[in-house]
From Swiss-Prot:
Family, as annotated: Belongs to the KdpC family.
Organism: Rhodospirillum rubrum (strain ATCC 11170 / ATH 1.1.1 / DSM 467 / LMG 4362 / NCIMB 8255 / S1)
Membrane-spanning parts: 7-27
NCBIfam families on file: kdpC, PRK00315.1
Entry's Gene Ontology molecular function annotations: ATP binding; P-type potassium transmembrane transporter activity
Gene: kdpC
Name by which UniProt lists this protein: Potassium-transporting ATPase KdpC subunit
Lineage, uppermost ranks: Bacteria, Pseudomonadati, Pseudomonadota, Alphaproteobacteria, Rhodospirillales
Pfam families attached to this UniProt entry: KdpC (PF02669)
Swiss-Prot/TrEMBL keywords: ATP-binding, Cell inner membrane, Cell membrane, Ion transport, Membrane, Nucleotide-binding, Potassium, Potassium transport, Transmembrane, Transmembrane helix, Transport
Membrane-topology annotation of the record: Single-pass membrane protein
Subunit structure of this chain's protein: The system is composed of three essential subunits: KdpA, KdpB and KdpC.
Amino acid sequence: MLRTLRPALVLFAALTLLTGVAYPLAVTGLAQVLFPEQANGSLIERGGTVIGSALIAQAFTGEAYFHPRPSMAGTGYEANNSGASNLGPTNQGLVDQVAARITAAKEANPGNYGGVPADLVTASGSGLDPHISQAAARWQAARVAKARGLDLQRAVALVYEFTSPRQLGILGEPRVNVLAINLALDERFPLAH
């Protein structure tokens, strides 16, 4: 019986070492050499302190900042709670949430008479999407400009500066990283305290 089990046990041990040890170490090593920033989480540092990741949304509130998409990942965009609400488009709970977010967005951005961009009132699949559409950023630009004492054209120019194009020219939509644009606002146009 041991003679018949031996090949299976050897194959099991070999595949465990190959796929459980060698392959992960090789991929991690290659990632560290070829893409060190991305392999370490695309962390953003200021003054030697990590303040966030370009891949994870952060909660920004107040008139002087661009706001990210709503998150279903807890109140603070908690990565360990990542996930969608799992509410279908006809679920009354989702309809009520979106209606409340539309009202709040219109109150926070007076003077915007067009429709609220969908990504400002709907959560992403992960609940942690760090990007908003260019339209969502432009929609908030007047509020941010007023709160910071900027000309609207400067705020809109900043939106265009921080707009990333479609991936490979065809995938997705142009998007704005909320953390990156808000950090630029604080560096270039600091708030008077």
